[in-house]
Amino acid sequence: MKKVLALLLGLGIAGAAGWFFLAWDWPGPAPAEKTVLIAPRTSLHAVTEQLAGAGTVAFALPFELQLRARGLGPQVKAGEYAIPAHASMAAIAAILVSGKSIQHRLTVAEGLTSEMVWKLVKADPVLVGDAGPVPQEGTLLPETYLFTRGMTRARLLAQMAAAQTTFLDAHWAARAPGLPFTTPRQAVILASIVEKETALPDERRHIAQVFVNRLKQGMRLQSDPTIIYGLTRGYPLGHGIRQSELDGATPYNTYVIDGLPPGPIANPGKDALLAVLNPPPGDDLYFVADGKGKSLFAASIAEHSRNVSAFRATERLKTPQVPTDSVRQAVPRLPRRK
């Protein structure tokens, strides 16, 4: 009888042990993906209780024992984790040990001012801490930035500034010869104007060519976005540019100042920066909208005047009143020489 009991006990222990280890790979109970945030310095017991409470494992104790038996307890890392539906204990353990937290993202569009970017960072609910002062205009690189929950706002802004520095350092030495600017900062200033002049990627380099040619010939840039920045620091003007604003003496108004304005008017993207560092060859000095969403370029004032007339004719077919939200488009003026 004792032998039978011993045999049964042994079979029971073996069965329990088999169940214990086989259960490691069984599908879990979660019907859908769950997000679990493990705070730093959380005990292993609390972690498994949290996972059971979230419904990702059936019971806390078996999972805790599994982790301890396999020597994985000390390797569990704090973080924010996405646990797939029906993930096994083995799969969940691999996620917790990997430390690969959920990657959140913040996309900074080309052409935003530093204050606009700063406000985006301040409003992001995943980031923590104070954003600090508004970064200097034009020092941030538009990009999609990935970060984990708990990253500080100040650190992300610093990362954006470092990204621009790295990009400029990588491309400044390969710039075209004979450009009418001598520092990376001046390149950023011109690139910011190019960025605000067009949303069309295939026009950026051509517009950069026009502005580079104008600077080389001592012609004023006469860029409408510089007027707007001087008045609103990049926010919408709310009306078409008026003659008084066109003639207004702000430091950024390139209709009245020679050369580049004192600083960028936005944060230019990589394409705009590359466009001013390596503009395509050509002699164009003017551009005007074609009324169909693109621009017409010209090397002579006569050709430019024909393009302006064509634009105005197109606008008359659309509406009896020519819109004046862009002086460059609606009432182009002849560039003035120094």
Kindly label every feature range from the protein language model.
Residues 6-10, 54-55, 78-80, 256-261, ...:
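N-terminal start-of-chain detector that recognizes signal peptides
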Residues 19, 23-173:
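Signal peptide-directed extracytoplasmic domains
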Residues 9-12, 35, 287:
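N-terminal hydrophobic or amphipathic segments with adjacent small-residue motifs
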Residues 43, 119-128, 133, 138-338:
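Bacterial extracytoplasmic/cell-wall-associated proteins, especially those involved in peptidoglycan
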